[in-house]
UniProtKB/Swiss-Prot annotation:
Its cofactor is [4Fe-4S] cluster. One of its GO terms (biological process) is iron-sulfur cluster assembly. This is Cytosolic Fe-S cluster assembly factor CFD1. Binds 4 [4Fe-4S] clusters per heterotetramer. Contains two stable clusters in the N-termini of NBP35 and two labile, bridging clusters between subunits of the NBP35-CFD1 heterotetramer. GO terms for molecular function: 4 iron, 4 sulfur cluster binding; ATP binding; ATP-dependent FeS chaperone activity; metal ion binding. It is found in: Cytoplasm. Component of the cytosolic iron-sulfur (Fe/S) protein assembly (CIA) machinery. Required for maturation of extramitochondrial Fe-S proteins. The NBP35-CFD1 heterotetramer forms a Fe-S scaffold complex, mediating the de novo assembly of an Fe-S cluster and its transfer to target apoproteins. Required for biogenesis and export of both ribosomal subunits, which may reflect a role in assembly of the Fe/S clusters in RLI1, a protein which performs rRNA processing and ribosome export. GO terms for cellular component: cytosol. Keywords: 4Fe-4S, ATP-binding, Cytoplasm, Iron, Iron-sulfur, Metal-binding, Nucleotide-binding. CDD domains: Mrp_NBP35 (cd02037). It comes from the Eukaryota. [4Fe-4S] cluster binds at residues 206, 209. Heterotetramer of 2 NBP35 and 2 CFD1 chains.
Length: 285
């Protein structure tokens, strides 16, 4: 169904509560191309591997990539009597994992979304109020880069739900950290707690000897965290094997969660999630 038709057809549906969701985490970046959606995907897979029930909401309306990341791009969302039903990801007995994205409502991957602010706001409001998530331990919200209509809308929609906070993603280069500063300032303006900064693409893991080489500069994310007095969650290298996993997951034996648990990045994300849980457990100031 065309997403604009979907907006019209669900108008007037009663809002759904997020009260059954224990923790809400937003994943933000000031700059495009820093691997934010990759971080969201791996965070979800890690939490699921830890046994948690996880939902992922993709509000990058003009560039929804999560359906492909999870290997469910051919799925379609349908509306039940209770609201929109998230698309499940097979976990084979691990925690529950499900995804909602505008990508499921588009006719094809090449369909462009050319919407002004009010229509984006309406779509995000529907995602927040009309999706039947059920009981979840975590809801991850993947946002577009920058501080645009989507960010303002999600901040407004979540203002009464008391989200745990935001994970801010950057790469080591100065051009990325400069834009992330704006994202941190945005979080502070809307009273969204920053759980920490992740430095993504911090080095390259050789697929043959597993040695990690710094192909970019290093330490930009940690310096940024110190500058703004926010937690530094860790650095994540580029691993070609993870790219291969995402691209060829349907040809491999096992679920995406099981395959990811064998990757070199899984232990790194386990440590990062422990830090996130520690930060989110602290009382908000």
């Amino acid at each position: 169904m065309d997403p604009e038709e979907q907006l019209e057809s669900t108008e007037g549906v009663p809002a759904k509560s997020l009260s059954l969701i224990k923790h809400i985490l937003l994943v933000l970046s000031g700059k495009g191309g820093v691997g934010k959606s990759s971080v969201t995907t791996q965070t979800a897979l890690t939490l699921c591997g830890m046994g948690y029930n996880v939902g992922v909401l993709d509000i990058d309306l003009t560039g929804p990539s999560l359906p492909r990341m999870f290997g469910i791009e051919d799925s379609s969302i349908y509306q039940s009597a209770d609201g929109w039903m998230p698309i499940p990801v097979e976990t084979n007995g691990k925690g529950k994992l499900c995804v909602v994205s505008l990508g499921f409502l588009l006719g094809s991957r090449g369909t462009s979304v050319v919407w002004r602010g009010p229509k984006k706001t309406s779509m995000i409001r529907q995602f927040i109020k009309d999706v039947t998530w059920g009981e979840l331990d975590y809801l991850l919200i993947d946002t577009p880069p920058g501080t645009s209509d989507e960010h303002i809308s999600i901040a407004e929609e979540l203002r009464f739900t008391n989200p745990d906070g935001a994970i801010v993603v950057t790469t080591p280069q100065g051009v990325a950290t400069a834009d992330v500063k704006k994202e941190i300032n945005f979080c502070r303006k809307v009273n969204l707690r920053i759980l920490g900064v992740i430095e993504n693409m911090s080095g390259f893991v050789c697929p043959y000897c597993t040695e990690c080489t710094n192909i970019f500069s290093k330490g930009g994310g940690e310096s940024l965290a110190k500058q703004f007095d926010v937690p530094y969650l860790g650095n994540i290298p580029i691993d070609p094997k993870f790219v291969d996993l995402i691209e060829n997951q349907k040809k491999m034996e096992g679920t995406l969660v099981e395959l990811y648990e064998k990757s070199s990045l899984y232990p790194i994300y386990l440590e990062i999630m422990k830090k996130v849980q520690e930060e989110s457990s602290k009382p908000q100031e």
